[in-house]
Amino acid sequence: MIKKLITSVLFLSTATLCFADTNILKVYTYDSFISDWGPGPTIEKKFEETCKCDLQFIGVGDGAALLARVQLEGKQTEADVILGLDTNLIERAKETGLFAKHNKTLDLNLPITWNDDTFIPFDWGYFSFVYNSEKITTAPKSFIELAERSDLKIIIQDPRSSTPGLGLLLWVKAVYGDDAGKIWEGLAPNILTVTKGWSEAYGLFLDGEADLVLSYTTSPAYHIIAENDFSIKAAIFDEGHYMQIEVAGKVLGSDQSDLADEFLEFMISERFQSIIPTTNWMYPVINLKSNLDKAFLSPISKNKSLIFDPKTAQEIRGPALNEWLEILSK
C-alpha cells in the first residue's frame, strides 16, 4: 500500500514538473476564429506538433474588441500575440506602445505592397453585402440603389466593436467622401439591427431575419463548398469594394517572445495558410502549392479594390464614426 502511494506521488510530481516545463503561448483573437468550424482548433494542433508548447487561443469578441481589451489591460495583459486586427486599426494599435516590431522579411502575395514593421497579415478579403438569391432576384449594385430599396432589410455590425463594421464605415467614406452622411441617411431606414460582431449578424441572416448582411465576397464559397448550396451570393457594387487585411502582432514585453516569433513565422507558412481558405473563408497571404477552389474566384477587379492606408484610416475613423452615430440615433 505504501509502495503504491509513493509511486502515485512520484507520478503526480513528475506530471506536475512536465506541465510546469511546458511553455504556454497565449493568443488573443476573435470568437469565430476559435469556433469549432473556424481555423483555430486545427492551427492549434499543427503548431503544437512542432513547438513543444501549449498554444492557448483566447476569444475576445470581434476584431475591434481585441484592441479595446489590450488597451484596457495595458502592460498587465496576459496575451503574447494579438491575432485579428486589420489595417484600419493598426495605427491606433501602434499608438498604444504595446506592440513589438517583428523584424522579419516577408514574402507575401497581397493585392498591395506590405511594408509595416509591426504587424503581419494572415488573410484578406473584400467586404460585401450577402443575400439569398432565391429570395432576392435582383440585388442592388450600389449603396445608392441599396438605400433606395425600401423593400430590403439589412444587418450590419457596430464599427466600435467589429472590424467589418468599421470596414463598412470606411467603405462608404472611400466611395462618397463628404457625401457619406447622405448615404447613411438613406440606409438608416433599411437597417434592421446593428450587432456587436460578425457571427451574430451572419447567424441572424441565416435565420431569415434580414435580406442582406454585411459580410465578404468569399462568404458564398462556404455555402458552395461545405453545403453544396449555390443560393447565397455576394452583391457586387459597381463603385468598388473595400478590402480587409487581417493581421497579427507580438505584444511588447511578452514572457514568450521567442515562441511568439515562432508562431508569427508559422502563421505565414504553408501549414497555417492552407487552413485559412476553407475555415476562415478568406484569401491566404502567400501562394499556396494547391489552387483554391473555383468558388474563391474574385469578382472584384483591381481597379474596383478600395482601401485606405493605416494612417488615413485612423484620421477618418473618428469623424466618420461620429457622423454615423448621429445619423443612426435619429
Where are these regions (language model features)?
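Extracytoplasmic ligand-binding site segments that recognize negatively charged/polar headgroups
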Residues: 24, 28-40, 61-65, 77-210
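Short alpha-helix C-terminal cap/hinge motif
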Residues: 41-57
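A ligand-binding cleft/hinge motif common to bilobed small-molecule-binding domains
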Residues: 88-92, 206, 210-231, 280
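Short beta-strand->loop
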Residues: 99-106, 117-121, 144, 224-242, ...
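Periplasmic-binding protein-like
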Residues: 112, 125, 184-188, 194-195, ...
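A bilobed periplasmic-binding-protein/Venus flytrap-type ligand-binding module shared by bacterial periplasmic
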Residues: 128-135, 173, 244-257, 275-278
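Mature extracytoplasmic/periplasmic domains
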Residues: 251-308
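Extracellular/periplasmic bilobal clamshell ligand-binding domains
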Residues: 293-330
